[in-house]
């Protein structure tokens, strides 16, 4: 029986649960890997993506604190690639152990993934994504006026000033053929971590750019390009809900893309959390006839693959 190719987008709770130490994050990923191994055991070929918000934020603080002519701070796009390697390494080890415990073969492999964006994307005119450490107003203005120039800072809810960067839409994933080859040879692939490293293509040349790609949209684009059967977006809740946290709250179990578009117009989903997941779910479900997206929690992921849990999104 042909295995289903599934792109799984891990939420932040799958990696970091409050303690930012390496050991705590490794422990969180050990638990996450057991759930992923259950999915593999049920007959799925997995390509795993993940977020990196807390990790890249902490790394940028470290870069700032150690910045000097001898140890210069690395740019954001380089920090994204560094966190892809770090989280990928931890998850590879955890998955290999989880599969071994189940008597399963196969190995996990991490692909440092570049994601092409358009240089004329509207997001570059209006950077909105806050990243990295907080600064005083004086420090922020000094950095904006420095010879490094081009940096944009905004006040963040009275907590200080933070750098803001564009969040452009992913256009293509440069390594998608490599990822497919690894899957076809029986490997579990970890790719497009943190939304991927954003790059601009100019003929044969590729150059990184300081931006942050939404991880759910990157997962959606990856699922399209590798022709996945399903996109599974794992988050902190079991179902997508309308009237969330109200007495009239209702879980959505099977829903069409058109129904979800109606709920978006009603502003049912929060901007910074569920809305991008729902939009990515719609995009993948509508990309090709027969595509399906599932949004659920990590603990229900295996049941969701059987159609017994989570919010299942299908084309209208």
From Swiss-Prot:
Pathways involved: Metabolic intermediate metabolism; carbamoyl phosphate degradation; CO(2) and NH(3) from carbamoyl phosphate: step 1/1
First-tier enzyme category under EC: transferase
Stated name of the protein: Carbamate kinase
Alphabetical list of CDD domains matching this protein: AAK_CK
Compartments (UniProt record): Cytoplasm
Pfam families: AA_kinase (PF00696)
GO biological process: arginine deiminase pathway
Gene: arcC
Protein family per UniProt: Belongs to the carbamate kinase family.
The entry's keywords: Arginine metabolism, ATP-binding, Cytoplasm, Kinase, Nucleotide-binding, Transferase
Keyword Transferase: yes
InterPro entries documented for this protein: AceGlu_kinase-like_sf (IPR036393), Asp/Glu/Uridylate_kinase (IPR001048), Carb_kinase (IPR003964)
Superkingdom per UniProt: Bacteria
Lineage: Bacteria, Bacillati, Bacillota, Bacilli, Bacillales
Main location: cytoplasm
Organism: Bacillus licheniformis (strain ATCC 14580 / DSM 13 / JCM 2505 / CCUG 7422 / NBRC 12200 / NCIMB 9375 / NCTC 10341 / NRRL NRS-1264 / Gibson 46)
